[in-house]
Regions:
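N-terminal strand-loop-strand
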Residues: 50, 69-107, 135, 139
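Short, hydrophobic-biased amphipathic alpha-helical segments
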Residues: 6, 29, 197-201
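Unchanged
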Residues: 113-137, 145-205, 210, 214-219
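Acidic, metal-coordinating catalytic segment for phosphate/diphosphate chemistry
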Residues: 31-53, 58-86
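Extended, positively charged loop/linker patches that create polyanion-binding surfaces
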Residues: 109-111
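Short, solvent-exposed positions on alpha-helices
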Residues: 24-28, 154
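Long amphipathic alpha-helical segments
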Residues: 1-25, 38
Length: 219
């Protein structure tokens, strides 16, 4: 979506400009550009990732220029991609999925990377919090540029990491984010939460499980 790309580029430029400028007039101009970006966003209300972990529409936000402006101005410092980490947990040839409370659809457990945690720690924690299973991260299977895959468009530019995790214990559990948990085989996939994971990505994870010597995917 071209207009979403305009908004994203304006946000990146203004965020960097406000970080490094020491000129009061330049700061004012960058803030005006942020307001313009918010007005552009309001005009088409794209899919974004603000109201929940990775999926809310502009209309669900109210899609006003004020709400978009708050979103655009929330990030500080030099703009870099966000990171989403997913745990890939296998049992008897099936993968562990959790049913998202936000949209009622299914995803591999995971979420935004937190500062102070390594990718393996994030994957292990997210799996435990969202499904109740205790796991140990063992291999980075993939790092994907989300914009290059068949996800719905969203405001944040994001990299997705898929981490193989070995099952060590625990039991199925629900959480604020989780309606249900279950294991599914490659030929019995549930309806997927597309902002979080695509069918092609899930099928690729099954290929990694079948061929553990495959190198890490990237891009």
């Amino acid at each position: 979506m071209l207009r979403l790309e305009w908004v994203r580029r304006l946000q990146t430029i203004t965020q960097a400009g406000l970080t490094y400028t020491r000129d009061a007039y330049d700061r004012q101009r960058y803030e005006q550009l942020q307001e313009l970006a918010a007005e552009i966003a309001e005009s088409f209300a794209p899919v974004t990732s603000t109201a929940s972990q990775l999926g809310a529409t502009g209309s669900q936000l109210g899609a006003t220029s004020e709400s978009w402006l708050d979103l655009i101005r929330a990030e500080k410092g030099y703009a870099t991609p966000k990171v989403d980490v997913r745990g890939v947990v296998e049992r008897d040839g099936k993968l562990l999925f959790m049913r998202e409370a936000h949209d009622g659809l299914w995803s591999l457990p995971g979420g935004w990377a937190d500062i102070g945690e390594s990718p393996s720690q994030i994957a292990e924690r997210e799996v435990l919090e969202e499904t109740g299973f205790v796991v140990k991260a063992s291999k980075l299977l993939a790092v994907y540029d989300k914009a290059r895959h068949a996800h719905p468009p969203e405001f944040w530019y994001c990299y997705k990491m898929f981490v193989r995790c070995e099952l060590h214990g625990g039991a199925p559990a629900r959480s604020i984010e989780t309606l249900d948990t279950s294991f599914f085989g490659v030929n019995e996939l549930p309806p997927l939460s597309q902002p979080r994971v695509t069918e092609a990505q899930v099928r690729r994870m099954f290929e990694h499980l079948a061929h553990p010597d495959l190198p890490t995917d990237f891009d």
